[in-house]
Every structure is written in C-alpha cells, then in structure tokens.
C-alpha cells in the first residue's frame, strides 16, 4: 500500500470504517410512527434540519424537538435517538487492524459528515467494544458538527489540508 508520493490518507467514517445502513433508521422511525421520515432524509438527500445538525448549527435537543414536530411523533427523546442511531452498525476488527497498520506508513486523518448524536453513539460503541479511544487511531479526526463544514464542499477538504500544511498530491 505504500506509494512513493503518498504521505497522508484521509478516511471517511460511515460506510468506509463504520458499517451503516440508512434503511434501518427509516424502519426504526416507521416503528414509532414516523412514516414520512424517508421524505426528510435518505442516504442521498436530506433537508436543512439534518444539514444544520451535521454542521453543528443546532443542538441535539433542538434537532429532536424539530424532528418530532415534523413527523408528528409523541415518543420520548430516547426513542428518537435510538431510531436515529439505528443506521450505525459495527466497526469490524479487520478495519481497526488495517488502520493500525496504515498508521505505520502514513499520516492518517478522519473527515466525517456526522452529528453529535451519532458521534456519542459510536464513540461509546468503540470504547466498549475495543477499549480504545477511537480518535487515537488518527493523527487528527475531523467531524462536520465540530468544524462547521460538510463534504463534498471543497472548503471542508481545504480545512484539513491547511490545518496540517498537507499537500493534496501527497
């Protein structure tokens, strides 16, 4: 895997490192009465409520309140959180080992479109499953809800490159 000019690798989280299934969240919302959830959110599109959550413009509690209102849900906040997190599956041990081996030859970074609710869930999963701090696998991990930027916008990638004086050709 070692390349002559490659010094840095920027990984994505969802669907690359962490297995995800968007349909599980849609199904979970349907079970609690959110039959129109897929009109608001899917793997390929989402409305502004989700965009704002991903770039940290709204708090998790506001997101939950607004989502309940949009879907006319009366369930508890924990039901909403569980449905929202249903898409988060597992992180296979082989991927963890791959990250550890790649780290020996390259600087590795993480750049993920995510939100605080999901972040808390997979951090807890990783700590419980592997007894490790997930972020320790990377030279630096960047999350959209923390940096206020989302992929595929160029400014998101530029932020990471500039933060570490990285050359995009490396």
Regions found by a protein language model. Give the residues of each.
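Substrate-recognition "cap/lid" segment bordering the active-site pocket of phosphatases
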Residues: 116-170
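A structure-centric signal for secondary-structure junctions around beta-strands
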Residues: 5-6, 105, 138, 168
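Short beta-strand/turn micro-motifs composed of small residues
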Residues: 112
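Surface-exposed alpha-helical segments enriched in charged/polar residues
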Residues: 97-100, 162
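Short, structurally constrained coil/turn elements
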Residues: 102-104, 134
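N-terminal helical cap/lid subdomain that shapes the substrate entry/recognition surface
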Residues: 2-97, 104, 115-121
